[in-house]
Amino acid sequence: MLKISLENIGKKFKNEWIFRNLSFEFSRNEPIAIIGPNGSGKSTLMQALAGAIPINEGKITYSNQEKTIPDENWHELLSFSAPYLELIEEFTLAESVNFHVKFKPFQNGLSTSDFLQIIELEKHKDKPVKNFSSGMRQKLKLGLAFYSQTEVLLLDEPTSNLDQKGFDWYISQVEKAIKNKIVIVSSNEPKEYIFCEKHLNILDFKIKA
Ligand SMILES: Nc1ncnc2c1ncn2[C@@H]1O[C@H](COP(=O)(O)OP(=O)(O)OP(=O)(O)O)[C@@H](O)[C@H]1O
């Protein structure tokens, strides 16, 4: 079973430590909320977990049955949804999905049309993403993350821009995902991580001068 272990990790920008001496372990069936005020370093930690930015100290290890997975293979295992990750604006919805599945196939042989029904956007399949509303974009990003055949789900501000119906959809989807994946939610909004019993508060890993 996949695990992600953090051993005394630290990240700084210029001279400012964003977090330091952070040790933690993530595993399946134990969703974790990364919490802390605006600007505390939640997104920075999420990006470090994804291997998208380097850390300055310590070690992040992905391992399966004690076998270490090389850094360059982490991306195959993870799905990441975040407001700052871009969609390809020129593509239609159907083109976006077909492009995505070339790199990250859907789990359980799900078809594009089934997927479009699940994200409740089938009637917009030929619309360019550049004409999508913010909530439609968010459902597309979340849907791709939930339904790709990956084992780690990184969700940064998952319900931003979602209305109540979209929020309820998110909760039902994430509850399914928890059973099969390592789920990590970064958030300022308690109701979007209500299913997380354990919290990682970035403020606990700030350096006291
Ligand atoms: N590339 C960068 N270069 C320099 N400083 C950065 C960089 N990225 C982030 N920071 C700084 O790191 C700190 C943490 O930012 P981060 O975006 O991780 O916070 P956050 O907890 O996700 O905030 P929010 O809740 O507002 O989304 C901030 O002070 C930010 O300005």
Question: Predicted regions span which residues?
Answer:
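Conserved ABC ATPase "signature" region
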Residues: 109-125
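The feature captures the beta-strand-to-loop junction immediately N-terminal to the Walker
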Residues: 35-37
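Helix-to-loop junction immediately C-terminal to a conserved catalytic motif
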Residues: 50
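Q-loop/switch helix immediately C-terminal to the Walker
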Residues: 84, 89-105
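Conserved ABC transporter NBD signature motif
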Residues: 55-74
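Catalytic Walker B motif of ABC-type/P-loop ATPase nucleotide-binding domains
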Residues: 153-157
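Conserved structural motif at the start of ABC-family nucleotide-binding domains
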Residues: 4, 19-21
